[in-house]
């Protein structure tokens, strides 16, 4: 069911004047109140009906002319009804609700006793901006013209703080729902509201916990997000009569300012009058309060709290600038009225996006919760019982958890895991104390036999895979379902709720609840099948309805007086809050690392932030003054908002703070008290990068495992406990790691030179060992099977803006199993299995690294090695790694086994996800070698920077390979192999340059790797992490540009069937069918088979891709865009980075329309390269930081031309439409546009405050290309443009559209004069005031 969007109707807007033509045609409209508390769902105004997906901001402006005097209605003595009851907060409790049912408006002059929490008295609109975010987009309505628009909070606050005399328009913020923002914690609802709200007491709790999106985007909404709103209105705003959406009740606290309400009771006669008034289209002529029998006007002053019951018709006026907090609720004590209002919305055809979200889904959950709480019989699915009902059960590993970034990803990744069998003996005792309860999966019934019951209890039936194809997928909670014993005969409904023990006492329901349940059952039964909206959590809707009917029958004679207990019948069991580190954001967590991190962080003792080492090059230098952090600093003239240190000063190796102590013994590090290396290590504090425990290695009691030291960060390792458990975590580095090599006189460069000099002293020794390595490896060739190991890298260099796409749990566990199968016969038995490789890497990164492994065909490695040896003779320093024993680390580079067998079994799955990582094997190793390992670790610990510099060059090569792989945009992404023995199909030309990839990913030729044998175990054994990578040979020239590989084979023309025959319909016929499907349906079709997967990715089906307002752009999205090769791409108002956009445009040569409005200039600057495609349309409206200097960079010819590319023209020379609204540009930018955009036809310059008449003179001057090419220009809200600009437009021979609306200095008379003067040659008309259009 569709729900509210970010937009909605305003609180205080006068109705529009109806056109005479509309009156004749009897067209009706409804303008809906959405997320408003004093104004409700239907906003009765008169407007021509438009498609619900149409952008209503383009509706022509209609000046409001009321048929009544608002001032008269404010003074009139006719509205003297006495509906509102004054109460004190202490009397407003749940017992009052059970007795009176919330049917009359209530006013509280003091908030004491209500349980309300509000911000400090000096809280202002500016503070709202700081807490919800200055860039948060809010829907704003122009009260006079009724035109809705979007503003950032920063823009609206500037308007709100403008003195009243200087406001040329009346703007009102509508629907700022601030749940899941920092403001949420400063505002608390009345206690009674929390007790009766369906969202809190009926909706599954785990879905609410999944909500992370602060806005009301329906695609990201996990529950009806209508709990807390902030309303900001200026003096003079007025909202005509309306009812709140869905029949919701409203709580309303006037924090600052005041309000005046007109109230009409929801009698059947008044509701009929209201519906007739809405459909009449005469709202602006008739004041509804004059049509009804009784109406009450009441004034709310600052500090008042107001409660509006369901269905009450009300209008609102704002006499003074006001700030109001409130919210909407559905509850169980006036359900018939709520349903009646929802039916009125149906009849008046209110748009879905302006209505209560998930309305009927909520009704189903209400019935289920009542049935469960009075009968202890649940109709939720097993999954939902585990997640929300919190029935005690053995804890499932958090690795089964799963989070999804968007609706599209959830559709593309169907979760096919099966529920685990959950039986434990220690549950039996507690099971006896519980009320008998049947299984909730509907597998048994009262009529089933005892043997069937026992069978049903003995093993839970597996839920079908389709059950998990949910619209909203959830993370596994801490607790899951507990199996209970089943009684053959159901007892009569006992009292109690999940939160309390079941007793023999009967639960009495109030007459209001019984009437509500009956109305809900009748309504849901009357709905057609396609409108029942049964939510995913309900197992059997028909059984639920029967259960409710039984409850109504049993409770028909309940005593109303005994039902008034002051205690809610329906509550969720109290959930113990998870401990969360202070300030930790509630981001989406992955299955393997992040979920465990949050749970284990509390065990880390006195864990603190790492601090500067104050010794590295970065710590000792001063600010650069050039990076975006420096430019933000106040001392460099910035606003000082980021509060970040200079990028070049970010510490390379931050250290543990001096307050850190051991979790076991509680003492600090004592490594300075001993001399020997092993003793030093046992006494130094080490922080685990997975569980974050800080501990002395000597204090650990685990003897049968090994720790893995992180050479990139001081005092950092993967502790033996996590390593033994197979847990995965990202390799940590200092924040300044990726900038270290850029520092002038960097120590990394010096160390590299020193290393070259030292290693150059032993060339003969290295050559002899290099010659022995191939012989050793060829002997082991027939019995070694390489695991698909990959190089693990910090995400800062390769991942796009640190976005991760975590793997599905079944893939993770599947690779673990595969890992154990791939262990070679010679591997040591004492080694623990390694965790799955790449669990924290993006699928695109994993697939690109898999590309390296596919470069080497079996049997060719010896030949390739001989070629490599010749090319490496001049780079002997690289050979030093050959005689170094490979150290084991968490995710081994490439593989440590000799070479691939003749035929490697690998599915296509390896292209899109991480391959498995087998355990490393170690050959024979004597005491001498072991001693060398320890001594080498002793040397390397203080020289961590060495490995960092060695990794940088190969990282570039890996990145380049990833880039080239990305161009295979039609490669299937089938996630499962067709058969186990199927060899992966490589695209043609994939091994054309095998010499570039013949060495291992850590820089060592694969033939030079040798295996280390088993050695005596020293508990706990600590092994240093090797350098992540080694630079490639100097003789290889690194390409700076993307090199596109040859195209892969075309998709098949027919669809193969199971019997080997081809389907009768060929590809082109299927493509014709696919062309009618939406993108969402295409994604579903892509999961059918490999052939459909390739067909559905045809670029003809994806000419336009729209990601506007997408909260995060992940690598998976980017790879999907590349694969589909769109012509038009909308990335407006996203947080895409420069690296991501550069990566995209390098691979989209056919892109023609690009929308980047609302992005940052840092991201848009990616277009200043020679790889920018020849765009036709470019939208950079409201790009932050885009001024004249940046426009010069954007329009000037690129300086990074490819070799042989001599074109010195701008890459934007083909632009036909350019949108620059809201930019701080001057005539200098317009001169560049004239020079570099000869084909420009449509130019949008609205809200550009520096555009003047002289700017128009430039655009239309003699000799300019724009004089003849310009057909449309938008100058709305350009306050410096006057009537004189119209005389310049007479020069343009092809001008057809001139938008001068809201230009203060442009007059209506000037426009009419322009039309008269142009009528000689061209007929122009004024479609709207100051909107000039050429008449055909």
From Swiss-Prot:
Residues bound to Fe cation are: 242, 244, 314
Q: Tell me, how does this one assemble?
A: Interacts with SKP1, forming heterodimers. The heterodimeric KDM2B-SKP1 complex interacts with the PCGF1-BCORL1 heterodimeric complex to form a homotetrameric polycomb repression complex 1 (PRC1.1). Directly interacts with CUL1. The SKP1-KDM2B complex interacts with UBB.
**Which stretches of sequence are listed as region Disordered?**
1-25, 410-465, 727-843, 855-1034
Which stretches does UniProt call biased (Basic residues)? Answer: 15-25, 932-941
What does it catalyze?
N(6),N(6)-dimethyl-L-lysyl(36)-[histone H3] + 2 2-oxoglutarate + 2 O2 = L-lysyl(36)-[histone H3] + 2 formaldehyde + 2 succinate + 2 CO2
Protein name in UniProt: Lysine-specific demethylase 2B
**Bias category Basic and acidic residues: which stretches?**
749-799, 902-911, 942-960
* Function noted in UniProt: Histone demethylase that demethylates 'Lys-4' and 'Lys-36' of histone H3, thereby playing a central role in histone code. Preferentially demethylates trimethylated H3 'Lys-4' and dimethylated H3 'Lys-36' residue while it has weak or no activity for mono- and tri-methylated H3 'Lys-36'. Preferentially binds the transcribed region of ribosomal RNA and represses the transcription of ribosomal RNA genes which inhibits cell growth and proliferation. May also serve as a substrate-recognition component of the SCF (SKP1-CUL1-F-box protein)-type E3 ubiquitin ligase complex.
Read off the SUPFAM superfamilies from this record: Clavaminate synthase-like, FYVE/PHD zinc finger, RNI-like
Q: Note the segments forming the LRR repeats.
A: 1093-1120, 1133-1154, 1156-1182, 1222-1247, 1248-1277, 1278-1302, 1303-1336
Cofactors, names only: Fe(2+)
Zinc finger regions typed PHD-type: which residues?
659-725
Where composition is biased (Low complexity), the residues are: 440-451, 819-843, 1014-1024
Q: What is the lineage of its organism?
A: Eukaryota, Metazoa, Chordata, Craniata, Vertebrata
List of residues binding substrate: 239, 259
The listed locations are: Nucleus, Nucleolus; Nucleus; Chromosome
| Domain F-box, residue spans | 1059-1105
Enzyme Commission numbers on file: 1.14.11.27
GO-annotated biological processes: chromatin remodeling; embryonic camera-type eye morphogenesis; forebrain development; fourth ventricle development; hindbrain development; initiation of neural tube closure; lateral ventricle development; midbrain development
What regulates this protein's activity? Answer: Histone demethylase activity is inhibited by fumarate.
